[in-house]
Amino acid sequence: MAENQNNLIWIDLEMTGLDPERDRIIEIATLVTDANLNILAEGPVLAVHQSAEQLGLMDEWNVRTHTGSGLVERVKASPFNDRDAELQTIEFLKQWVPAGVSPICGNSVGQDRRFLFRYMPELEAYFHYRYVDVSTLKELARRWKPEILAGFKKQNTHQALDDIRESVAELAYYREHFIQS
């Protein structure tokens, strides 16, 4: 393992909803790639404990999705609060990327960053202010080269580590079929 300023930090959060003023983080996962999108390491995948009251605020989609994946039970049983998950994640990242150099990478990471800012501010500050948002390329491909969209199928497991791996693979797909074409 070697700290490298060109490595990229990828993150995905699962939340109880989309509003950081009301909803909470229930799972966090990170991984690190090199600049060529080769996965170097996967960080801890942590269910973040939330109260039954907080979980009761989830809408039907979140209840169905996170119950079906087993995440709700993992959240109820988890010994980790927001701060525990934040610190474990930062300790992992320090081994691979210095603070303040990697953009936050993933799909729709602007949403994740809003939750990090509210509930895990030290982790949010670990990232550079820039973004590598795969969903931007997807939206551009939808408008400029829609025929390539059928070539990449997501599994949509809504499990944080699976989602990050898919984001890395999706960016590699767009690099080959959209950016370099």
Swiss-Prot record:
Keywords: Cytoplasm, Exonuclease, Hydrolase, Nuclease. SMART domains: EXOIII (SM00479). Residues 8-171 form the Exonuclease domain. GO terms for molecular function: 3'-5'-RNA exonuclease activity; nucleic acid binding. It is an enzyme of class 3 (hydrolase). Its EC number is 3.1.15.-. The keyword Heme does not apply. The active site is at 129. Pfam families: RNase_T. CDD domains: Orn (cd06135). It comes from the Bacteria. HAMAP family: Oligoribonuclease. Belongs to the oligoribonuclease family. 3'-to-5' exoribonuclease specific for small oligoribonucleotides. This is Oligoribonuclease. It comes from Yersinia pestis.
